[in-house]
Amino acid sequence: MRVTYLAGAIALGVLTLAPSAANARVTRADVDDPTICAIFDAANTWDIETSDIAAKKGSTKEVRDLGAMFSRDHKAVRQQGRDLVKKLHVTPTPPKDFALATDHAQAMKQLESTSGKAFDRAYLTHEVAYHKAVIDAINNSLVPATKNAELKDLEVKVGPAFQAHMLAAQRLLDGMGQ
């Protein structure tokens, strides 16, 4: 299966640092509930990691605060997913071709090697694209492919939070101007 920059919460594909929504498509035939659980966990973990960097390296208080909020929110959502996995006695199974791990490593490398306003722009651009890809994957691929009602409910429940994250990052990015 090829999901490209959309883990845990679901979708990821990095062109420079931004996930590609086109590459984030997951077909129903590609995933089952254990795979969805693994993707859900990875997507949240990876956004925690990028956001932890922003909480430390952001050049403005707004970017640092956004990174801290995103990290906190994704830790809570990841824990909800892990609690559900335990309750359902599911063993998360990462996709066979989990290229997302490579994509995430590239994003982390770029964020770690950037600073100042360039870091802020790279992080915010990444977060907007990442959350767009995740929202697309949740709505168009994961929810339709999910068999378990509780897992589907969790995916649907986190959708508005992903939307809010995307809009918050977009507002800060728009405020940066050119």
Model-based region annotation:
Residues 3-8, 17-178:
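His/Met- and acidic-residue-enriched segments that coordinate or traffic transition-metal cofactors
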